[in-house]
Amino acid sequence: TEYARNYLTTYGQQYNYDTLLHIAQAQEQQIRALRQMAIAANHQHFFVDTEMLVMQVWCEYVFGNCHAYIIEQAQQQQFSLYLLCKPDIPWVQDGLREYPNELQRVELFHYYKSILEAQQLPFIIIDGSYEQRLPKAIQAINTLT
């Protein structure tokens, strides 16, 4: 679950710096619950769309600053693999999505990539058409088992 979507759908698309802290805290609770469910069900993998690195980039990109809580959680979280989607497909409005400008999308891609590299986190770039992306993601995930 992506808590930000639920929040913005419920309360409106206007948000501020402190709103992002609330969203991050709720998202972190959902991630913990999802992890526990995956462990209890003996699943090898579980998938998270929005985690604390996303929240960190969102805060820094929009507000030029980030809450200490988000940074601390981002540094402590552990995931086996990040799937970093390259912005080489058309942007599609979904009612909540921001940054239709290609330059901003590329800038954000490089921002995420630089953080992943700086923290030496395992990631793969998912690019190409919609049809090409899913097999690439599946292949990358299959290397984990």
Please give the residue ranges for each predicted region.
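Active-site flanking residues adjacent to catalytic metal/cofactor-binding acidic residues
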Residues: 1, 48-50, 85
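Conserved substrate/cofactor phosphate-moiety recognition/catalytic segment
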Residues: 1-28, 32
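Short, basic/glycine-rich phosphate-binding loops at helix/coil junctions
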Residues: 7-10, 51-56, 87-93
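Glycine-rich phosphate-binding loop used to anchor ATP phosphates in small-molecule kinases
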Residues: 21-78
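Alpha-helical elements of Rossmann-like donor-binding domains used by nucleotide-donor carbohydrate transfer enzymes
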Residues: 22, 26-29, 111, 136, ...
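A glycine- and Lys/Arg-enriched "phosphate-lid" helix/loop adjacent to the NTP-binding pocket
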Residues: 62-132
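Basic, glycine-rich
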Residues: 126, 130-145
